[in-house]
Amino acid sequence: MERRTTMTSMMKGFVLIAFASLFLVPVYGQAAEPEKHDAKASKLDTTAIEKAIGKAGELKDEVYKISMPRTDLKVMVKDVTLKPGLALGSWVAFKQAGNEAVVDGDLVLTEDEVAPVFDKLRKEGIEVTALHNHLIGETPRVMFLHVAGKGDAARLASHIKAALALTKTPLGELARKPGEVSTKTGAEEAGFNAEQIQQVLGHKGRVKGGVLQVSVPRPEPIKMEGITLPPSMGMATALNFQQAGEGKIAATGDFVMIRDEVNAVTKALAEHGIMVTALHNHLVHGSPELYFMHFWANDTAEKVAKGLRAGLDAMKVKPATN
């Protein structure tokens, strides 16, 4: 009888331990173990992602990124009509991490789209890591919703598509893969001297849809819950330029900074007539802790480029080109 009682107590103990262990499994949104490289890890299923989202993407450095510009919107800042590639580009980026995929992204939404998309993402298990403005004084008002998730790639993509379906974001049939090189030179397609801007910045970019896009990666690895996020997953300073009338350009984007760089960059931009329009986070559980500073400039190409170069210098970013 005593032996039976002892066995019963042991079994109850095992059940309690097993039950408690269910709450110790790390999920996206809680502390996780450091990233591991499993030789048997599955490969990112880009075909399944394409089919789920309804649009093709671009694979680079093990990241599959799908761009979804809001070409349906006509947004103006004062008298400047924004090209989609300047400040209206929704995107999601997928990366394989062990036997699961991780996703993060930035969804461009009108004010009336925010509530239904936010609610749908929550119900589908996709995390919202930030909701904020990037611009000031734009019409109509545009908001930016940052998302993150971890799990099966196709399932993550289908959940995001379910939220996008509540917006007017153009998707349609599977699109041709982006990144095709225009037959025009950068200056011809952009309508301004894109090469001059790149020389001043000390970093090369690309012209797409009439917009010069320059990406400047941070020097240190960026992680979220132990998973490394490459620059293409929104972890690089983004500087975008478009023509804005005779002899002028408009520029916007965001500086990706650690806390000790924030005040120095703010000062550098202000001294060159560049307006800071937002300062906030994009991630939760990020390491190091990052701050994203958005800006707006409308002046000659040379003046704007010099101002943004001063911002990069304040971050002690080394030029990539001469």
Placement of each model-derived feature along the sequence:
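Bacterial N-terminal signal peptides that target proteins for export
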Residues: E2-I17
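Bacterial N-terminal signal peptides
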Residues: F14-P26
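Boundary at the C-terminal end of the N-terminal hydrophobic targeting segment
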Residues: V27-A31
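Long, contiguous binding/interaction regions
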Residues: A32-R141, A148-L290, H294-N322
